[in-house]
Amino acid sequence: LDDRQTLMLMDRETCHRIKRKDILYVETVGRCTCFHTAEGLFHSKEGLRIWQKKLDSSLFVECHKGILVHVRWIQSMEKDTILLETKETLPLARRRVETVRAVWKSFQEKYA
């Protein structure tokens, strides 16, 4: 993964630069998009669909309505839950299990 790939987020009056590889997951919270990273939370006024187009679909996959998970951080998957390496859990929609599993497997084969 290229560490130099960064995103610029506008959080009210502050501009934040975050590395894509440090994003654990992205979720919709109200009318904002929240980026969960190793360094903390960052918010953006742009919607999740806009960010989904900007993020690499081979790394970020929608695991549940309104949540994009970065597959590099997935530790394990169960029937309806994803466990991240940070020990956080995310919901996994039944209809998205196969897609998430396929993207995660592809990532493992390419980068692990």
Residue map of PLM features:
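Conserved binding/recognition cores within well-folded domains
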Residues: L1-E85, T89-P91
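Eukaryotic intrinsically disordered, low-complexity regulatory linkers and tails enriched in Ser/Thr/Pro
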Residues: L1-T14, R96-A112
